[in-house]
Amino acid sequence: MKQMPNNFRRVKFIWKYLAPVLSPIFCKLFGFHRSVYKPVEEPFLLVSNHTDGADPGFVLSDVRAYFRFVSSDHVMESPVIRNVFRFIGRPLINYQKDSSDVIYNNMLETLKRGINVQLMAEARVTDTGETGYISRRNATLVKEVGCGLITHRITGGYLTIPRWADERRKGPVYGEVVHHYTKAEIAQMSEDEVYEAMCRDLYVNAYEENRVKKQKYIAENPAQSAEYVLYGCPKCGTVGKLHTKHDKLWCDCCDFEATVDDYGFWHSKDMEWDTIPEWDKYQKELIYRLIDNATDPDEVLVEHDEQLVSVMDEKGDVHLADEHGVIRLYKDSIEVLWDGKSTRVKGTDVKKISYSSKGTVGLVTDDVNLRIKTKEPRAANIYLVGVRYMKGHKTI
């Protein structure tokens, strides 16, 4: 008999009786149109695309079964929130300081115990409205355990509240179980086929879908704070000099201007595209070019000051260390100035770099685990894309 965790019965009781009561209230609050599905067999790995911070609630409203969420450690930074989540849901926490093997093995052990696991396959909310990179190890996990696989797709979530947005737009969100691949089906599939099915089922391009649906997502200030995602000027090619107000975006270094409409599309006489995914492809190339063209390794390529720099300790608690920190990108390194000291590390030596919330950069080195938040909108992706490029990877 498989041994279950001590509080498994309590948590399962909460989910069985409380979730169905709260789900209709949640759906009305977020404009979510659910399509309830009761799994035909267990255990399973439930994977979803990630469009919004409310996605776990959307998944829970659609799939009537108990499962353990995989959560990033930034969600659990507050001890109060961490204890509440552990009481009602027992999430599997993916700590940034750990290697990917740790969370993989935790999911593996959980599934082998017969307990379902839910995972946001992209690992973070989409920046662009298009489904991003999905790790192949998710397919490896399914094949190693021999469990079922449920693919759950969310549409409308990104345009309801784009990653940069300060306000939620009025518009519908939909969820659906695309397919439940049973254990028997998984046994007949290769790892490649499982991975291809996962990527296919979860793919969403919010802009291409809305080009057909023409659904309005209305906000008073639809462009406000888009600097969290948009950093490359389509006209002069500078990085980190874009600003927004109301429905407008402009560049400090030239006369570039753009506006965004109620359907989420961007318009300017100086750019060939009208969607964030296309804009993002362009601006990533600006970062690559900036690094390639730099000749002095000590030349600051991009810099942001007035950063809130915190340190995460071994318990997962976060402590503010400096309210006036600085983050810098160089040709082959990244630097954080904080609390009278400098943490500068070669991109190739960075243990892990991540991006959470709207603009928090997570930086793990051999010596420290930092969280760099910002007082004013700025794109964390500048540093993420830059460091990954130093490591030899172009960010998808």
Where are these regions (language model features)?
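Short, surface-exposed charged micro-motifs
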Residues: 241, 257, 324-326, 352
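Phosphoinositide-dependent membrane-docking surfaces
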Residues: 46, 327-360
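Anionic N-terminal interaction surfaces
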Residues: 268-326
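Soluble catalytic domains of membrane acyltransferases
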Residues: 2-196, 212-213, 220, 235-236, ...
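Cys/His-rich short segments
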Residues: 218-271
